[in-house]
Amino acid sequence: CDGVFSSELSDDLTSENIEISRLADVGDLHWAQNYYGVLEEKGQNPVNRPLAAFNTAMASDGALINIKGEVKRPILILGVHNNPAEAVLHHLIKVDKDCSVTLLESGPFATRVNTVMEVFLEQGASFEHVRAQGRDHDRWAATHIFSDIKEKAKFKSFTLTANGILTRNECVLTLSGNNCAALVAGASVGDGKKFHHDDTIFI
């Protein structure tokens, strides 16, 4: 709620074939240590992304998700915005070999939000991402998705953006294996004079 995790609004984070942790709770010995910030750092070349670097250094929370087997239902990250607030969130998703997951994101999260999502897809893995941004006239958002897609892995992401004063969505994909695939799509709808939207994709 307003960029702060709410246990009251969340389901139990334990589930079969899924390991979910919060960035705010983990220590140095967590599996994410070897992955956190790796793709963001690589994504600074050939174009600097200072907001992404700021996020990696300053993120207060985020979801650390490791998919280890069959997942029967999607994972939802829901943002609830009640009061003026700022949020810096960093998510990390690792999908193991031949595993698949669908991740849903919905809600404005905060008045000003900076998010990074790093997605590691092992051989034959599949990741489907559907995101709804809005409907919030006062939102300022900078989002970044970085993904490493290995052999025969599939990455799909769709974003629907409604309103917002300023929205910038970046997607940086590395196709690092044969016969891998990536599909990125989106739609934007703005109502009002103060509306600026920008999508950028690097492969």
Language model region names:
Residues E8, D12-E19, L23-V26, W31-I203:
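Conserved beta-strand/loop scaffold segments within soluble protein domains that form the structured core
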